[in-house]
Amino acid sequence: MSNNTYQHVSNESRYVKFDPTDTNFPPEITDVQAAIAAISPAGVNGVPDASSTTKGILFIPTEQEVIDGTNNTKAVTPATLATRLSYPNATETVYGLTRYSTNDEAIAGVNNESSITPAKFTVALNNAFETRVSTESSNGVIKISSLPQALAGADDTTAMTPLKTQQLAIKLIAQIAPSETTATESDQGVVQLATVAQVRQGTLREGYAISPYTFMNSSSTEEYKGVIKLGTQSEVNSNNASVAVTGATLNGRGSTTSMRGVVKLTTTAGSQSGGDASSALAWNADVIQQRGGQIIYGTLRIEDTFTIANGGANITGTVRMTGGYIQGNRIVTQNEIDRTIPVGAIMMWAADSLPSDAWRFCHGGTVSASDCPLYASRIGTRYGGNPSNPGLPDMRGLFVRGSGRGSHLTNPNVNGNDQFGKPRLGVGCTGGYVGEVQIQQMSYHKHAGGFGEHDDLGAFGNTRRSNFVGTRKGLDWDNRSYFTNDGYEIDPESQRNSKYTLNRPELIGNETRPWNISLNYIIKVKE
């Protein structure tokens, strides 16, 4: 301040100049009264203690105070909170903090979040002994019977010890058998329990009794008399030697092919009630009855003639026959059919559809070896394909000739040259291997041609060279050799007569062939 408040400011002064420089007051505070008014109540009265409803100051607790968790006036820091969280509440599976149960909690026995001390356990145990009494319907504590109570036999709230039980038994035995005389069939007395061996011996009579244990173990055998159990049907069927057979279980043990048993006689062959295995044929049974509807299981062997007078025979299985006749016609087997028309045979077929699935058109392609195994083994890949899918021959547009060169072609009479030095008709002629296709050809032959001198203007062509022999042979070597035409007519039909016509109608074409008719070739691929 720039003035002397001690000597010059009166007690009544309200506004004295104030400089806020280097203070925490804002710059607009410029007099003392404003500065005093700006001081907060905490600056005048001090900062209050913090609570759940009042802002203020508070202490930071120690780690132990945080772990105890009972102080409500101090603030937890992150560090002490982390320490507390490292000690979780104890459970049945986690180690941690716990509190002690009160007496009421120990007695109630329902709290599962607090531990019980030995003192609290004693309180709970004493309470159980005082309040939890054993009855016929609930577990609990019970007192030992006194001797008078045991002998009186009237108390229903105490327990008997072995000693008290023995003392009561002595009393009761004395009442029942006042003397130690042996019991007989006519007099009361004491008895001794017989052993199993004594019961089986069967000689003891007076003074002995049979207990349930001895009775149940004195089983009947082939050597000893005794008790025996009636067997179930399953036990009787399994040949159990320790049970007795009743009329019902005897009747229920029907005879089978694997088990002896009772049987019922029948005069009718075939299925009976209970199955064929439970019935037996009587002496007068129809082994093969003539009433119809019979089923014969197994093999039927007929040594002589089998005659069906009326109707027919419906056979759904396999009939294995080595020969015979049906209505005068011989029975043919599958093997005989294959020998007649074997797989791989080719025949002409006058239709565009196959006779059966056993045949294929000879139009190329393949078949499946798994579907046609005999074809695959016999023909193989001769006509293409592969072992899994062998090929079919393609015979469309082809004639067939014998394979190889036979005796007709190797005969000397058709081989070599004739008396004029010309090759005979068998020279060079041969068939191919099976499945080989030969292209069309024309045998070598000659034509008489017109003569021409040294000229390059032949109407149907001529050779390029001109050193061919002419009419004067050795003296004429400068001639060309002229070609004839292909056999086609030269003049139009309208201008020709018999003199100017070369050939018969429709004789000339692209092929050299005889008269023919086209049919389908088919091949057998399976039986």
UniProtKB/Swiss-Prot annotation:
It comes from the Viruses. Keywords: Host-virus interaction, Late protein, Viral attachment to host cell, Viral attachment to host entry receptor, Viral tail fiber protein, Viral tail protein, Virion, Virus entry into host cell. Its main location: virion. Signal peptide: none annotated. One of its GO terms (biological process) is entry receptor-mediated virion attachment to host cell. It is found in: Virion. InterPro entries: Phage_T4_Gp12, Phage_tail_collar_dom, Phage_tail_collar_dom_sf, Short_tail_fibre_C, Short_tail_fibre_C_sf. GO terms for cellular component: virus tail, baseplate; virus tail, fiber. One of its GO terms (molecular function) is metal ion binding. Structural component of the short tail fiber. Adhesion protein that binds irreversibly to the lipopolysaccharides component (LPS) on the cell surface of Escherichia coli B strains during virus attachment. After at least three long tail fibers have bound, short tail fibers extend and bind irreversibly to the core region of the host cell LPS. Belongs to the tevenvirinae short tail fiber protein family. Homotrimer. This is Short tail fiber protein gp12. It comes from Enterobacteria phage T4 (Bacteriophage T4). The lineage of its organism: Viruses, Duplodnaviria, Heunggongvirae, Uroviricota, Caudoviricetes.
